[in-house]
Amino acid sequence: MTEHNHDAELTINNEEELLTLYDENGNEVLYRKMLEFYHPEFKKEYVVLAEEGAQSDDEDMIELVPMINEPDESGDGGKLVPIETDEEWDMIEEVVNTEINE
């Protein structure tokens, strides 16, 4: 993953990358990383994913899947875990809406 200066303010990386994850049935699902950012208030790195090839719905919306990226000891990659709090959900929604509108 991307190195960040974690003492700085909000850091955003919108370089796309493909990731393979597994669904609840153990099937491989390909996701595109749409956004990656570190938020200093929560002191966590987040990624926002969209299923590769996903079609927009009637309102031109594609489902986005936000996750927390917990880096491993070397700082490379790590594991993706679910969002933990309503405050994080609200913050992620604000960041995504800001990035989409720019």
Swiss-Prot record:
Cleaved signal peptide residues: none
Taxonomy, superkingdom: Bacteria
Coiled-coil annotated residue ranges, if any: none
A Pfam family recorded for this sequence: DUF1292
Family statement: Belongs to the UPF0473 family.
This protein's name: UPF0473 protein SERP1179
